[in-house]
Amino acid sequence: MRKRDKRLYHLLLVGCVLGSLSLTAQADKGIIIIKRDVQVRNATIPPLIPDPSPTTVNANPSAHVLKQTNELSDGDFAGISSGAGISNLVTQQTNNLGGNLGNQNQLPNLAGGRGTGSGNGISNMVNSSVQRGLAPLQILTGGGK
């Protein structure tokens, strides 16, 4: 058998150590160009002028941005509204609808459909649409029989 050369392993080990000690590339704080117009030109001729108004974003972490990245306090959570009071507000505003909605003679886009008490009402149309949509699931679960 051939004797292994330890110099190769030492060189490999030194390369790994030097590679791990090298400095990582850091992004510079500045402007990021998102979109710019590039002029049509030959490859050997430099562009006449660069785009005068590229779409850019300023990536400098200003004090305003850094202030927004702090943890939320209890006061911040106390100011959040869950929207639970919206339903009361909606029912208060809709109690006095001007007119009796149950006595409509005919609904639009329905031939011969009455507003209340008929089989062609909106609720029956929605119900049948939902049932047709759920039919494949009922077949899979065996509930359609």
From Swiss-Prot:
Keyword 4Fe-4S found = no
Keywords linked to the UniProt accession: Chaperone, Periplasm, Signal
Q: One cellular component GO annotation, for this chain's record?
A: periplasmic space
Q: What happens when the gene is disrupted?
A: Deletion of just fapA in the overexpressing strain alters the fibril composition; fibrils are shorter, more stable and are composed mainly of FapB with minor amounts of FapC. Deletion of the entire fapA-fapF six-gene locus shows no visible growth phenotype.
Q: What is its main location?
A: periplasm
Q: Where is the signal peptide?
A: 1-27
Location in or out of the cell: Periplasm
Kindly indicate whether the keyword Cell division belongs to this entry.
Answer: no
Q: Which family does it belong to?
A: Belongs to the FapA family.
Assembly and oligomerization: Monomer in solution. Interacts with FapC but not FapB in vitro.
What does the UniProt function comment say about this protein?
An intrinsically disordered chaperone for fibril amyloid FapC that guards against fibrillation, pro within the periplasm. Upon overexpression of the endogenous six-gene locus (fapA-fapF), cells form large clumps during liquid growth, make large amounts of biofilm and produce relatively unstable amyloid fibrils.
For this entry, the protein name equals Functional amyloid chaperone FapA
Native species: Pseudomonas putida (strain ATCC 700007 / DSM 6899 / JCM 31910 / BCRC 17059 / LMG 24140 / F1)
Q: Mind giving the lineage of the organism this protein is from? A: Bacteria, Pseudomonadati, Pseudomonadota, Gammaproteobacteria, Pseudomonadales
